[in-house]
Amino acid sequence: MPHSLRQTLSRQDTFTVRNKMDKNEVISFFDIHSTTWDENMEKDDSKMNEILDVAKISSGNSVLDIACGTGVMIDYYIERNVSKVTGVDISSKMIEIARNKFKKYDFIDFLCEDAEEFNFKYQYDRVMVFNAFPHFPNPKALIKNLAKAVKSGGTVTVAHDRGRKDLDNHHKSVQASKISNGLISENALEEIFKSAGLVDIYKKATEDIYIVSGVKA
């Protein structure tokens, strides 16, 4: 492989922080958009189920849903007959809406916490980060913390229902670039997963979907 191409690939596969994000700005952005979040959400069932299949979410699983927002993924977990869901989000307004939507389910609970730092007391079968990864200021700290929150043999999955370029363009269109580091390459995320002790890494990154999933050894 030519040296110049190796350098290009190396740059693409190395994570660098694009923005020094202020978590208060992240909270403010999602608080402001919480009331219109569901009406602006377009869900593609085929993509959602592909993501859930890769994450191996199935009957009886306990699921930790990171940056759950208003609970976009929770109906899909319910359809798969999971045993427990804990939704976590840094936005209190998002959490308030999610709690109201799913208050009749006693196996679903919500926490307004910072997932990069929160000490999870329970270990889950599956951990999901859907449509949120670029909004975490320290993704390495996030994955390291989530790896502690998953059982041995369980999965941690980062997924988006858009490709990297499409997501960057979307963030620009909704004035969210300031609170986004951009979606890093699947290879760079694989290295972060490995450094957190996750193995058997699955990667898929196309123009319209992005999935990286690993198993806790």
Named regions from a protein language model:
Residues 5, 9-56, 72, 157-183:
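Conserved class I S-adenosyl-L-methionine
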Residues 64, 70-117:
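Class I SAM-dependent methyltransferase SAM/SAH-binding core
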Residues 128:
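A conserved beta-strand element that flanks and buttresses the S-adenosyl-L-methionine
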Residues 131-132:
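Short catalytic micro-motifs in class I SAM-dependent methyltransferases
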Residues 141-152:
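A short glycine-rich, Lys/Arg-flanked "PGG" loop and its adjoining helix->strand segment in the class I
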Residues 181-196:
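Short alpha-helix
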Residues 197-198, 205-217:
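Core SAM-dependent methyltransferase catalytic element
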